[in-house]
């Protein structure tokens, strides 16, 4: 595994938003599929719920979970998230720090559309920004 998809990348793919093509390219690599954080499950559900589409969550999440590896939240990631938040000079939500830290401790590239991840120093995280 070389990439971890942030929730923003999963949502871009699911809703065919800008950056979806880059996520699709990563998902096509059957030998080395990307991962997602277990936190992405609740963020994806929250997005569907906010759009009034909560009922489709189970089937859609199952479909996503079949093509990615789901990474658990570990104590090492929690510690790294604290280090990352301390190093950021700008606001970085805790949930995003935990997702970034999961990629960081696994030494894989975080794929995202959230500009606020760019406050994370390169010594902590490899990033692929798929936003506009």
Where would I find each of the regions flagged by the language model?
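Short, well-structured N-terminal submotif of metal-dependent ribonuclease cores
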Residues: 1-36, 48-62
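Short loop->beta-strand "edge-of-pocket" segments that line small-molecule binding or catalytic clefts
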Residues: 3, 31-35, 66-71, 109-111
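Histidine- and aromatic-rich ligand-binding microenvironments
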Residues: 5-6, 36-37, 92-93, 114, ...
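A generic structural signal for short hydrophobic patches within well-formed alpha-helices
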Residues: 10-11, 41, 78, 117-118
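Amphipathic alpha-helical segments within well-ordered protein domains
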Residues: 45, 62-65, 82
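Short, hinge-like loop/turn segments at secondary-structure boundaries
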Residues: 51-55, 88, 127-131
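Active-site neighborhoods of divalent-metal-dependent phosphate/nucleic-acid chemistry enzymes
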Residues: 69-113
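Acidic, PIN/NYN-like endoribonuclease modules and their adjacent C-terminal/linker elements
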Residues: 100, 104-132
């Amino acid at each position: 595994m070389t990439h971890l998809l942030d929730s923003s990348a999963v949502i871009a793919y699911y809703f065919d938003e800008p950056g979806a093509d880059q996520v699709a390219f990563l998902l096509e690599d059957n030998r080395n599929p990307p991962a997602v954080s277990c936190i992405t499950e609740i963020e994806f559900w929250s997005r569907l719920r906010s759009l009034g589409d909560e009922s489709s969550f189970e089937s859609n999440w199952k479909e996503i979970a079949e093509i990615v590896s789901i990474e658990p939240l570990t104590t090492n990631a929690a510690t790294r998230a604290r280090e990352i938040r301390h190093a950021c000079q700008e606001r970085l939500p805790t949930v995003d720090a935990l997702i970034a830290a999961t990629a960081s401790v696994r030494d894989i590239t975080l794929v995202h559309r959230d500009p606020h991840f760019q406050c994370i120093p390169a010594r902590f995280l490899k990033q692929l920004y798929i936003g506009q």
